[in-house]
């Protein structure tokens, strides 16, 4: 679920969203893209006739942008509650499962010639399927918007206080809740009221660049700071839980290879949130030069592999800097007066601020298609939906105590739905029994994959609700 996780949906043309002519549905079996009856003397159009112009490398870059998101900030926290080896093993499992999930999507797309995640839902489950898929994508994007605004709430007061040489907890105009409202009204809302994305679509490249800068800075600061636990004033004290000392759970600079506590059940949801890119896979497939299922799977594997390395390095060096005291929003751990980290904060704030309206566009579009499918464009409705969404997300961010809860809930609901459950349902319903019998090994695998997603969702939500009910979320949370 990625800083640019929704961008591809909005940039698609009507065909890419499945708005195909009626006779096109009858021709879906002929190729990945529908074609009309050829004129006399012309050969029928095939998939290669609609070949995209995007190179393999650029497709990898685009999909990496779709994967990369705010979830990277919470991975060191996840490692602190599982240990280095267990975390890396779980991260590898999520990466491999994401790759298999994309394999299922590409197989379904090849069978029916549909290029949008929502349209696969309609083909598999009828109109209700399209509604369910659109609702899940909207939920995930609302979660992504919330995580971006929470970063603004957490980091902007530190940036302003640094420039003004003030205590970030001192004056009223440095309160995070007030600042996210100001940013939403003055910057995000005007951008969200645009009818088209325009140059906002290029913020995806900015987001990946900022996160690469963040990774390099995390590695550099580890070697510069050494051990920060308990005695190094560079680390910012945790303010979300006054009862916690700065040294947190571990009083020494000793890395844990394996560990377990009540917070470890946030680990896999945070990882799942960090790997969601599935609604963008088919649009990127459409634009791929010399498209084929094998070539697009290679794009996905390279992108996921690159993000696995980037996530693993960020989590490892972040954890080895702060150990068990690391917070769910790792950037908040560094000193507000550190010049390098100040530059990182500015870059991340710029990226997430410009990405919020990009994520809002497909949510509004989905709501309009579901609630007002036959209505012409209306400025009052266009503005009202944007206002309602921004108010809803602002209230959510103000009320939620930590970004970990956002990562946890979205990573336990929409993420397993998009990665595990829906692709397996699509495969079971769309791939005909003549091609793959119901009791064939591929369909049994897909069924087990979907069941795994349901179990993952139920277990993660169950433990999180238990934590909230017992108050452990606040006692142990950062």
UniProtKB/Swiss-Prot annotation:
Taxonomic classification: Eukaryota, Metazoa, Chordata, Craniata, Vertebrata
GO biological process per UniProt: amino acid export across plasma membrane; amino acid import across plasma membrane; glutamine transport; glycine transport; L-glutamine import across plasma membrane; L-histidine transmembrane transport; L-serine import across plasma membrane; neutral amino acid transport
Role noted for this protein: Symporter that cotransports neutral amino acids and sodium ions, coupled to an H(+) antiporter activity. Releases L-glutamine and glycine from astroglial cells and may participate in the glutamate/GABA-glutamine cycle and the NMDA receptors activation. In addition contributes significantly to L-glutamine uptake in retina, namely in ganglion and Mueller cells and, therefore participates in the retinal glutamate-glutamine cycle. The transport activity is pH sensitive, Li(+) tolerant, bidirectional and associated with large uncoupled fluxes of protons.
Activity modulation notes: Not inhibited by lithium. Partial allosteric regulation on ions sodium binding.
The name this protein goes by in its record: Sodium-coupled neutral amino acid transporter 5
Carbohydrate-modified residues: 232
Disulfide bonds: 227-253
Gene name in the database record: SLC38A5
Topological domains, Cytoplasmic: 1-57, 115-131, 194-198, 285-301, 362-382, 427-445
GO molecular function list: glycine transmembrane transporter activity; L-glutamine transmembrane transporter activity; L-glutamine, sodium:proton antiporter activity; neutral amino acid, sodium:proton antiporter activity
Assigned protein family: Belongs to the amino acid/polyamine transporter 2 family.
Pfam short name (any one): Aa_trans
Signal peptide bounds: none
Catalytic reactions on record: L-serine(out) + Na(+)(out) + H(+)(in) = L-serine(in) + Na(+)(in) + H(+)(out); L-alanine(out) + Na(+)(out) + H(+)(in) = L-alanine(in) + Na(+)(in) + H(+)(out); glycine(out) + Na(+)(out) + H(+)(in) = glycine(in) + Na(+)(in) + H(+)(out); L-glutamine(out) + Na(+)(out) + H(+)(in) = L-glutamine(in) + Na(+)(in) + H(+)(out)
């Amino acid at each position: 679920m990625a800083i640019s996780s929704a961008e591809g949906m909005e940039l698609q043309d009507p065909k890419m969203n499945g708005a195909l002519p009626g006779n096109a549905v009858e021709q879906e079996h002929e190729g990945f893209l529908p074609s009309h009856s050829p004129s006399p003397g012309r050969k029928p159009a095939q998939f290669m006739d609609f070949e995209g112009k995007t190179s393999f490398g650029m497709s990898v870059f685009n999909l990496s942008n779709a994967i990369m998101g705010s979830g990277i900030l919470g991975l060191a926290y996840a490692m602190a509650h599982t240990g280095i080896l267990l975390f890396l093993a779980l991260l590898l499992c999520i990466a491999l499962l994401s790759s298999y999930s994309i394999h299922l999507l590409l197989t379904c797309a090849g069978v029916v010639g549909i290029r949008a995640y929502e349209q696969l839902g309609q083909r598999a489950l009828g109109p209700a399927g399209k509604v369910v898929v659109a609702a899940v994508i909207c939920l995930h994007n609302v979660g992504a918007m919330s995580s971006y605004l929470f970063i603004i709430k957490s980091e902007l007061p530190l940036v302003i206080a640094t420039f003004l040489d003030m205590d970030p907890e001192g004056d009223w105009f440095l309160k995070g809740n007030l600042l996210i409202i100001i940013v939403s009204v003055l910057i995000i809302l005007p951008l969200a009221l645009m009818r088209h994305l325009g140059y906002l679509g290029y913020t995806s490249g900015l987001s990946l660049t900022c996160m690469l800068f963040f990774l390099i800075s995390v590695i550099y600061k580890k070697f510069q700071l050494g051990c920060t636990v308990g005695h190094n004033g560079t680390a910012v004290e945790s303010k979300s839980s006054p009862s916690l000392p700065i040294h947190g759970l571990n009083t020494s600079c000793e890395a844990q290879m394996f560990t377990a506590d009540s917070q470890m059940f946030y680990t896999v949801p945070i990882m799942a949130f960090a790997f969601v890119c599935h609604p963008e896979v088919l649009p990127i497939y459409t634009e791929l030069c010399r498209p084929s299922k094998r070539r697009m799977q290679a794009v996905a594997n390279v992108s996921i592999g690159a993000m696995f390395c980037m996530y693993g390095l960020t989590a490892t060096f972040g954890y080895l800097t702060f150990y068990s005291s690391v917070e769910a929003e790792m950037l908040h751990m560094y000193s507000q007066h550190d010049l390098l980290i100040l530059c990182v904060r500015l870059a991340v704030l710029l990226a997430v601020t410009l990405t919020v309206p990009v994520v809002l566009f497909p949510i509004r579009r989905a709501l309009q298609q579901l609630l007002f499918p036959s209505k012409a464009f209306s400025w009052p409705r266009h503005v009202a939906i944007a206002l309602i969404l921004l108010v809803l997300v602002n209230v959510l961010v103000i009320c939620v105590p930590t970004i970990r809860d956002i990562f946890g809930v979205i990573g336990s609901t929409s993420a397993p739905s998009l990665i595990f459950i829906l692709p397996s349902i699509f495969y079971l319903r769309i791939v005909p029994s003549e091609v793959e019998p119901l009791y064939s090994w591929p369909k049994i695998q897909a069924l087990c994959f979907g069941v795994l997603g349901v179990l993952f969702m139920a277990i993660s939500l169950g433990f999180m609700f238990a934590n909230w009910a017992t108050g452990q979320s606040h006692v142990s949370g950062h």
